């Protein structure tokens, strides 16, 4: 179930504050955050966020196509190593 339209998008207050400060100053420094649940709003466009994936911070550059999604969608938490090749010759 999606979030109600009347509630509006959820953005952590500390994250919005950091973006507003950078927009006022005109800087585009990397913003480190653990808030994967925050929705990307139009004022995030052009900023780079270091989103925590549980182990490290993954850099995410926000573009126009990302608006409406959550920051955590662009920082995968699991690394896929690939399937093990089925070696039938070694079993004999």
Swiss-Prot record:
Question: What keyword terms does UniProt attach to this protein?
Answer: Ribonucleoprotein, Ribosomal protein, RNA-binding, rRNA-binding
User: What is known about what this protein does?
Assistant: Protein S19 forms a complex with S13 that binds strongly to the 16S ribosomal RNA.
Q: What is the protein named?
A: Small ribosomal subunit protein uS19
Question: GO molecular function: any one?
Answer: structural constituent of ribosome
Gene Ontology CC annotations of this record = cytoplasm; small ribosomal subunit
Q: Which InterPro entries match?
A: Ribosomal_uS19, Ribosomal_uS19_bac-type, Ribosomal_uS19_CS, Ribosomal_uS19_SF
GO biological process terms held by the UniProt record: ribosomal small subunit assembly; translation
Q: Which Pfam families match?
A: Ribosomal_S19 (PF00203)
Q: Which family does it belong to?
A: Belongs to the universal ribosomal protein uS19 family.
Q: Where is the signal peptide?
A: none
Top-level taxon? Bacteria
């Amino acid at each position: 179930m999606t979030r109600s339209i009347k509630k509006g998008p959820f953005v952590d207050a500390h994250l919005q504050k950091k973006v507003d400060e950078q927009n006022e100053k005109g800087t585009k420094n990397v913003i480190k955050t653990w808030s994967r649940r925050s929705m990307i709003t139009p004022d995030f466009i052009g900023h780079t966020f270091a989103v925590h994936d549980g182990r490290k911070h993954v850099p995410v550059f926000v573009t126009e196509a990302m608006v409406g999604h959550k920051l955590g969608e662009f920082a995968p938490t699991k690394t896929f190593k690939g399937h093990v090749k089925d070696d039938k010759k070694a079993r004999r």
